């Protein structure tokens, strides 16, 4: 009975727990986060929509963790803006990135893809 009372008092903060902490056996090390192996990229999908309603092609590929290049040069400015808004939401929802490559061309990349750019140095 005294053991139960002691546990209740420790739980309520009215007493200190005097149990000794044991260190981990010498063969064990501290826990650490192991990085996930990077997936190999074997495909990039290039998409040339002519109207906004063709957006489902982007979704299917991006859900499969395939980077998508979207060339919106054939879209009206209104549809291009809608497509960018949709692609931005898609990339945020699936933890990806969206970057402008040039003009109306954008790269939608999944989380596991790292993009590096070369900055032009001013001379």
Curated annotation (Swiss-Prot):
**Coiled-coil stretches, from where to where?**
none
- Annotated Gene3D superfamilies: SepF-like protein (3.30.110.150)
**UniProtKB keywords:** Cell cycle, Cell division, Cytoplasm, Septation
GO terms, biological process:
division septum assembly; FtsZ-dependent cytokinesis
Give a GO cellular-component term.
Answer: cytoplasm
Q: Where on the tree of life does the source sit, at the highest rank? A: Bacteria
PANTHER family documented for this protein: CELL DIVISION PROTEIN SEPF (PTHR35798:SF1)
Q: Cite the record's note on assembly.
A: Homodimer. Interacts with FtsZ.
- Which family is it part of? Belongs to the SepF family.
Tell me what this protein is called: Cell division protein SepF
């Amino acid at each position: 009975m005294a053991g139960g009372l002691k546990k209740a008092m420790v739980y309520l903060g009215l007493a200190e727990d005097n149990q000794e902490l044991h260190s981990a056996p010498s063969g064990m090390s501290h826990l650490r986060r192991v990085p996930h192996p990077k997936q190999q990229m074997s495909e990039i999908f290039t998409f040339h929509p002519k109207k906004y309603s063709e957006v489902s092609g982007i979704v299917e590929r991006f859900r499969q963790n395939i980077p998508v290049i979207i060339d919106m040069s054939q879209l009206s400015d209104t549809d291009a803006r809608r497509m960018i808004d949709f692609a931005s939401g898609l990339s945020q929802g699936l933890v990806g990135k969206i970057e402008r490559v040039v003009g109306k061309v954008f790269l939608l990349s999944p989380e596991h893809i790292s993009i590096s750019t070369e900055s032009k140095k001013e001379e």
